[in-house]
């Protein structure tokens, strides 16, 4: 039996991979990293060191485009409801690889969702049929994100810097079209150049498509309205109140688009 762990570079996917190795041995375990080409450089460092620590094969695959290039080619700006980047760069790229290299009858796929996300388990299982999908971190002993980061430290791995900066995940260099105000505010704080590029793409597509579109929406008098990164930046710089608890974030491999 072959065991393929979707390895995002996150703490949960590392702990999931570690449980798979402990249960089945390292010989038939593979870590599959699907690169969006905008990952933080420290994410690449972490996935390499994690694979070495677990002593398992690491396979890196990529469509070759970035999320922003996908938005432009699709003439559609990703947002918190529909993320073409997730569908094309993550799900389709991974499916093309999995279906051409493995057989459902002797392969199990593993995702790094934990016990607090059981409501998200059904969608990947449906999307990946006829392959079997399991969630090692959904089982006891149950661990929090803090617990998982402690596992990294105990294993001698440097915690990815995105976590140290307060990001909820270690994907896409801090960008995510599903992110909320709080997440994008953190991107603006730590990576202003990345924020500026995401803002420029958003503005370019608004002009090119002639539509009032944005990555985010904000509720005004109970009505959800587009809220651009340009507006968010203006609010931050003017010290106007924003919703720092609006995190949103990564649903790649989880939400079917």
Per-region residue spans from a language model:
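Nucleotide-activated chemistry modules centered on ATP-dependent adenylation/adenylyltransferase
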Residues: 1-257
């Amino acid at each position: 039996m072959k065991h393929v762990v979707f390895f995002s570079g996150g703490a949960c996917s590392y702990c999931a991979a570690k449980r798979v190795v402990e249960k089945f041995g390292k010989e038939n375990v593979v870590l599959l990293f699907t690169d969006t080409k905008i990952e933080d450089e420290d994410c690449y460092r972490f996935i390499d060191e994690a694979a070495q620590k677990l002593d398992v094969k690491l396979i890196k695959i990529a469509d070759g485009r970035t999320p922003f290039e996908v938005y432009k080619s699709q003439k559609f700006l990703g947002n918190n409801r529909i993320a073409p980047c997730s569908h094309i760069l993550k799900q389709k790229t991974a499916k093309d690889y999995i279906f051409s290299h493995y057989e459902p009858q002797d392969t199990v796929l593993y995702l790094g969702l934990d016990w607090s996300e059981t409501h998200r388990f059904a969608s990947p299982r449906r999307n990946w049929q006829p392959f079997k999908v399991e969630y090692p971190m959904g089982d006891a002993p149950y661990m929090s994100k803090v617990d998982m980061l402690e596992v990294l430290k105990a294993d001698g791995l440097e915690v990815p810097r995105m976590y140290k900066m307060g990001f909820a995940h270690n994907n896409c260099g801090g960008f995510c079209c599903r992110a909320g105000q709080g997440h994008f505010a953190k991107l603006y704080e730590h990576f202003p150049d990345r924020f500026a590029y995401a803002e420029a793409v958003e503005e370019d597509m608004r002009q090119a498509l002639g539509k009032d579109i944005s990555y985010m929406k904000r509720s005004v008098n109970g009505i959800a309205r587009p809220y651009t990164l340009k507006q968010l930046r203006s609010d931050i710089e003017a010290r106007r109140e924003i919703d720092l608890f609006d995190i949103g974030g990564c649903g790649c491999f989880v939400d079917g688009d």
